[in-house]
Amino acid sequence: SEYARMYEGKVVLRFDDTDTKVKPPLPDAYEWIEEEYEWLAGKTADVVIKASERMPIYLEYAERMIVDGHGYVCCCSAEEFRGYRENTASCPCRSKSASESLTDWKSMNDGQMAEGEAVVRVKTDMSLPNPALRDWPALRIQHTPHPVAGDLYKVWPLLDFQSAIEDREQGVTHIIRGKDLMDSTRKQTLLYDHFGWDYPESLYWGRVKVHEFGGFSTSGMRSSIESGEHEGWGDLRLPTLRALRRRGFSARSIRDFWIGLGLTQKDISIPMQTVESFNASLIDSSAERRS
């Protein structure tokens, strides 16, 4: 939001919620996140996008990619394709005609194929130095109902495909992401090349570790909450906005902390005391003093 304010841009708050099986979205989280963003930024997001509500767009682009010969339906097992990829060899499915892949595509969407039986791949170059970029998977079959969208769709996009299409749809000019997602930039650039699009400017940040919390992830915290180890997302032992609010942190102090770190690819490790000092400084500056 700070960059949007500085350069008169707009903030797109997007829920990349197309994984129905491994990391299904929490229905309550949509409202929570919007509320927490408004608290932290001091304003609502300019645009709010739920990917699960925009499935027809992603499926249309996937079909267009297949028709144009830039993608195909792969029926190899994960193990079989791994072997082809490691040996820089094309799998048999790669030579399918567009009409053959479209027939399989229809079967995928009609629910006639089981999970894992087929995926849609972006056709790149199987001799690329980076194995992760070789004919990477864009969409897969998921029969597990979506917590919000239900069982309307049988084929769901993976994050790299979905977010790339949505960035284009929303006119995104700058992407700020963790440096661990550099391969996502490389994959999406190849996809954009297929469609004849210019890829947005990409900026990266390094990992920020707070000593007292150690290593943590959203999925790890969710697991600990579901197991009863933590008492919800506002548990004071968790590094969430909800918990920090309960501990008395102001939104401005958190913003000042992150702005102070700056946008750098360097990994940073700090004590919680550093974060607390920003909050204490604001409290001290606004405290009423009597002589």
Kindly give the residue locations of the regions a language model identified.
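Histidine-anchored nucleotide/phosphate-binding helix
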Residues: 1-8
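Short glycine/serine/threonine/alanine-rich loop segments
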Residues: 8-9, 42, 70, 197
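Short acidic (Asp/Glu) and glycine-rich catalytic loops that position anionic groups and cofactors
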Residues: 9-13, 41-42, 164-172, 220-221, ...
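Conserved short loop/turn motifs at secondary-structure junctions
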Residues: 14-23, 47-56, 79, 176-177, ...
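Secondary-structure capping and boundary motifs in well-ordered enzyme cores
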Residues: 25, 29, 54-57, 154, ...
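A glycine-rich helix N-cap at a beta->alpha junction
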Residues: 29-54, 61
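Active-site cores that bind ATP or allylic diphosphates and position pyrophosphate for catalysis
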Residues: 50, 64-221, 229, 240, ...
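Extended, domain-scale alpha-helical bundle/helix-rich regions
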Residues: 234-291
